[in-house]
């Protein structure tokens, strides 16, 4: 792989990159900024939103109050954005769009991570279900109330498309998960503003999606080591990790375990990023897209790992599921978190007056499905600590997350 100029942002934009000068615009038309591109404005709106600040107090893997140094949704999001920008720069794409998609991709996550999402989806199964990606879309198109002229953030078409389809098309022959119905909130919005759900998203969105994988593959190891749920010796079971650890141990034979873990994590990020850039360049050379439209019309993603790295990543993910995500201590906390979210849903659905004024007003006029969605919107926006406090306020006994 040639590294000439790859880390610098002044190289000419690739012809297949998203170009803000040709943005498809916004649902509510706005005058253009004289100082910022549409994608830069999207990024800035995302950063200044309430939903972005709430990520600080939402769980990644470990419950937020377990320690000050474990990753939250916010720190994870910042790490994803950094990797996404690096990938976009290397491939001569629009860094601002890649960053915007990365920054917004986790907006819809509930308190307590995927446990909270599963709990809400269970309670919402008769009312259209709950999906964090669809919830992210609801937040940026409806639930944020910052602007006088519109609800949401009125993001550009390209950022919305990247948010909804960063993991692949949702419909058609190339759908990433054809057996899973498209969440109703996405279908409802798509009827108003066509995001072309059967086509691949931009390369910038693809960079954001794979940056998410790179970030959590590495940083969950870091947090797992810090928590004592993983050990450097156990990571020798993972071929990729062992190969990198052998390099570290050979070069630094007397290095302490903490720094050894950090050296592993940073090397893993580097090797995955370099593999992805090289593989993306190979796919681009083969597909030879000449425009953004050519990217959308491809039969596969053009940004992805090589077959060899993908195989190694699958082994790593299996290891993390077995030894970290389903570790006994994590599972116990997940059961407690599940109880908290389901209890809160049941209470607020039965008696909407338990919710704050801005959420309960008008509930008496809603049918059951609309009321359930209102309650889900309220609960999904909670931070971990707020959910615990509300449960303690409403119930005599709250499950212990400590």
From Swiss-Prot:
InterPro entries in the cross-refs: dGTPase (IPR006261), dGTPase-like (IPR050135), dNTPase_2 (IPR023023), HD/PDEase_dom (IPR003607), HD_domain (IPR006674), HDIG_dom (IPR006675), PHydrolase_assoc_dom (IPR026875)
Similarity comment text for this entry: Belongs to the dGTPase family. Type 2 subfamily.
Database matches in NCBIfam families: dGTP_triPase, HDIG, PRK01286.1-1, PRK01286.1-3
Superkingdom in the source lineage: Bacteria
UniProt source species: Brucella suis (strain ATCC 23445 / NCTC 10510)
Lineage summary: Bacteria, Pseudomonadati, Pseudomonadota, Alphaproteobacteria, Hyphomicrobiales
Keyword flag rRNA-binding: no
PROSITE patterns associated with the record: HD
Keyword Ribonucleoprotein part of the UniProt annotation: no
One example GO MF annotation: dGTPase activity
HD domain sequence ranges: 73-217
UniProt entry keywords in alphabetical sequence: Hydrolase
Protein name: Deoxyguanosinetriphosphate triphosphohydrolase-like protein
Gene Ontology BP annotations: dGTP catabolic process
Pfam families to which the protein is assigned, alphabetical: HD (PF01966), HD_assoc (PF13286)
């Amino acid at each position: 792989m040639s590294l000439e100029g790859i880390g610098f942002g002044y190289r000419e934009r690739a012809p297949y990159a998203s170009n803000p000068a040709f943005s498809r615009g916004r649902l509510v038309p706005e005058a253009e900024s004289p100082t910022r591109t549409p994608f830069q404005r999207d990024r800035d709106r995302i950063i200044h939103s309430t939903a972005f600040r709430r990520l600080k107090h939402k769980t990644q893997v470990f419950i937020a109050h377990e320690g000050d140094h474990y990753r939250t949704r916010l720190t994870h999001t910042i790490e994803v954005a950094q990797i996404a920008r690096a990938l976009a720069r290397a491939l001569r794409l629009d860094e601002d769009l890649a960053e915007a998609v990365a920054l917004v991709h986790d907006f819809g996550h509930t308190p307590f991570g995927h446990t909270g999402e599963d709990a809400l989806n269970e309670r919402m199964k008769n009312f259209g279900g709950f999906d964090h990606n669809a919830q992210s879309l609801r937040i940026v198109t409806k639930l944020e109330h910052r602007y006088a002229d519109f609800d949401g953030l009125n993001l550009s078409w390209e950022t919305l498309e990247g948010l909804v389809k960063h993991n692949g098309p949702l419909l058609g022959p190339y759908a990433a998960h054809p057996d899973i119905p498209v969440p109703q909130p996405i279908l409802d919005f798509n009827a108003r503003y066509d995001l072309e759900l059967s086509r691949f998203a931009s390369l910038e969105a693809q960079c954001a999606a794979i940056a998410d994988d790179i970030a959590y593959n590495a940083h969950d190891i870091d947090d797992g080591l810090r928590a004592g749920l993983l050990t450097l010796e156990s990571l020798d079971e993972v071929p990729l990790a062992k190969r990198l650890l052998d390099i570290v141990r050979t070069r630094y034979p007397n290095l302490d375990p903490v720094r050894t873990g950090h050296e592993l994590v940073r090397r893993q990020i580097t090797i995955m990023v370099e593999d992805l850039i090289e593989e993306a360049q190979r796919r681009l050379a083969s597909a030879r897209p000449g425009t953004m439209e050519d990217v959308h019309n491809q039969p596969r993603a053009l940004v992805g790992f090589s077959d060899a790295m993908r195989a190694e990543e699958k082994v790593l993910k299996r290891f993390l599921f077995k030894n970290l995500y389903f570790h006994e201590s994590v599972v116990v906390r997940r059961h407690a978190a599940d109880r908290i979210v389901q209890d809160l849903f049941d209470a607020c659905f039965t008696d909407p007056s338990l919710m704050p004024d801005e959420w309960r007003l008008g509930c008496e006029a809603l049918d059951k499905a609309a009321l359930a969605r209102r309650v889900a919107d309220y609960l999904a926006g909670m931070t971990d600590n707020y959910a615990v406090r509300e449960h303690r306020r409403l119930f005599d006994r709250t499950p212990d997350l400590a």
